């Protein structure tokens, strides 16, 4: 490595907000299954506090050694609906509290996996878990929840979609932060290091470490140097920058894997913003020539960014996975917040952008008077984009306040303007229930 590359890396960290967003340890809880929920909860607590006890110390050690901030240390676990199903419990709050207690004991920021996979229907534990979500998120601090309601192979479980509209409303009513820790997916992935949607898939190894990087500020600075150049130059610039970012992510992942004695999983190639100025995906898109995000051309700019980040990342790391796409969470991106406030970015445009990025309607505040059926219909629209396009899509929306209010979440979750929602009813559509069948192009065997 020559001196120019060293100074480049220093600039990325000190001036351009580059960091490792998260190192996430995925832990299988299948060996914690027990017919008694309290015994299962104790086994869950013991396994997490044993397998991830050194995660925070190792993360801090690597950050100090390399001089690269590692912002979050997190844990993801096997979907809890699978663990709870063996019991006769009427709710899974004891398991949620065991997760929360374990997370606090080892000092991680969040723990994900209070989850259910219901893309083709409910099993015994699924419905119980889903109905436990509002109370579980209200009574814990670090637990995150996710529900997969559709996939390209199975279609969309519209009964679950309807239920999740109601659950999101109830969750927002019971706690200020609950809905910000709840994601509804189509085509959820098993190795996602990012919250709130992380869970540890049943096909994964017993314990795995996955890494998520963050570098929108680095990409923006690189694009500032090629203003006025053709899209060929823009694409090459993004690709080379993504290579550097991902290379560092892989290094951190491998170091953490060796020191913790666990398998290295993947680097997630997602560009994840924060509310800090200079750390915005929206500003990257504007640097390509858009006056403001949300105007015509936004989806095309996002497509270029997303694709070139993947191309550069795949060259840098032979194990990539997770969501691997640009995140466009409104509350967590100062450029997105500004675009909503100036009227150029609305829900409909964000839905269009979902066809490109990983998570579409993400960290969006909507009026608390929005009916549960309308929320369910938003989930159905996002799921349809994912199912038809064979990609992950998700919804994380917070029904709070009135249109035009500002909702403060604090920290990395930022601030969200309450956005306008279409007032026409979708109630009769959602009331049908049942399954939207899988698309014809999913039939490949």
Swiss-Prot record:
Record Pfam families: DUF711
PANTHER family tied to this protein: UPF0210 PROTEIN MJ1665, UPF0210 PROTEIN SPR0218
Subunit organization: Homodimer.
Family: Belongs to the UPF0210 family.
Name recorded for this polypeptide: UPF0210 protein SGO_0390
């Amino acid at each position: 490595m020559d001196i120019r590359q060293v100074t480049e890396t220093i600039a990325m960290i000190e001036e351009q907000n580059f960091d490792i967003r998260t190192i996430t340890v995925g832990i299988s809880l299948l060996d914690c299954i027990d017919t008694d929920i309290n015994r299962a909860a104790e086994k869950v607590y013991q396994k997490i506090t044993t397998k991830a006890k050194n995660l925070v110390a190792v993360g801090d050690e690597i950050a100090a050694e390399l001089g690269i901030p590692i912002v979050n240390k997190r844990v993801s676990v096997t979907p809890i609906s699978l663990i709870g199903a063996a019991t006769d419990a009427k709710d899974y709050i004891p398991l949620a509290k065991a997760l929360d207690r374990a997370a606090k004991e080892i000092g991680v920021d969040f723990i994900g996996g209070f989850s259910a996979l219901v893309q083709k229907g409910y099993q015994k534990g699924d419905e119980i878990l889903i109905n436990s979500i509002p109370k579980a998120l209200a009574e814990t601090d670090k637990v995150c929840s996710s529900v997969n309601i559709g996939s390209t192979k199975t279609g969309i479980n519209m009964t679950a979609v309807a239920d999740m509209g109601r659950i999101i409303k109830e969750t927002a009513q019971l706690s200020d932060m609950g809905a910000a820790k709840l994601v509804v997916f189509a085509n959820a992935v098993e190795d996602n290091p990012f919250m709130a949607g992380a869970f540890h898939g049943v096909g994964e190894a017993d314990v795995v470490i996955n890494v998520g990087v963050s570098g929108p500020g680095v990409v923006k600075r690189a694009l500032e140097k090629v203003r006025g150049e053709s899209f060929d130059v823009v694409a090459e610039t993004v690709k080379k920058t993504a290579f550097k970012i991902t290379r560092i992510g892989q290094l951190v992942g491998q170091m953490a894997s060796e020191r913790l004695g666990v398998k290295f999983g993947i680097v997630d190639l997602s560009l994840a913003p924060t509310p800090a100025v200079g750390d915005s995906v929206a500003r990257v898109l504007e640097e390509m020539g858009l006056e403001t995000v949300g105007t015509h051309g936004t989806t095309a700019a996002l497509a270029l960014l997303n694709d070139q980040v993947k191309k550069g990342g795949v060259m840098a790391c032979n194990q990539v996975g997770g969501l691997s796409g640009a995140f466009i969470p409104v509350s967590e991106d100062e450029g997105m917040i500004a675009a909503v406030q100036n009227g150029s970015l609305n829900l409909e445009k964000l839905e269009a952008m979902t066809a490109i990025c990983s998570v579409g309607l993400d960290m969006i505040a909507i009026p608390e008077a929005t009916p549960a059926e309308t929320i369910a219909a938003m989930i159905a629209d996002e799921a349809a984009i994912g199912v038809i396009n064979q990609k992950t899509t998700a919804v994380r929306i917070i029904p709070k306040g009135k249109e035009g209010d500002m909702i403060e979440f604090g920290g990395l979750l930022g601030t969200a303007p309450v956005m306008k929602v279409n007032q026409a009813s979708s109630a009769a559509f959602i009331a049908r229930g049942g399954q939207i069948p899988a698309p014809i192009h999913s039939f490949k065997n």
